[in-house]
Amino acid sequence: MANIKSAIKRAELNVKQNNRNSAQKSAMRSAIKAFEANPNEELFRAASSSIDKAKSKGLIHKNKASRDKARLASKLAK
């Protein structure tokens, strides 16, 4: 465990950020799975939105976001 006060604070913040990021990423995955189980326009918009939010927060790379959205759009079109 860290001894320096600022290091202790950073460690606590890292735990909070990790929890927040994990929840956001999990919500994104859940939205994608919901869409894949029942592809429709409403679930597509929700999944696409959650992917964009994860991208804007730096949780996923912009190219992965684009690839995922393209795959979802392809499934919606079928």
From Swiss-Prot:
The keyword Signal does not apply. It holds the Pfam family Ribosomal_S20p. GO terms for biological process: translation. GO terms for cellular component: cytosol; small ribosomal subunit. It comes from the Bacteria. Keywords: Ribonucleoprotein, Ribosomal protein, RNA-binding, rRNA-binding. InterPro entries: Ribosomal_bS20, Ribosomal_bS20_sf. Transmembrane segments: none annotated. PANTHER family: 30S RIBOSOMAL PROTEIN S20, SMALL RIBOSOMAL SUBUNIT PROTEIN BS20C. Belongs to the bacterial ribosomal protein bS20 family. Binds directly to 16S ribosomal RNA. This is Small ribosomal subunit protein bS20. It comes from Streptococcus mutans serotype c (strain ATCC 700610 / UA159). The gene is rpsT.
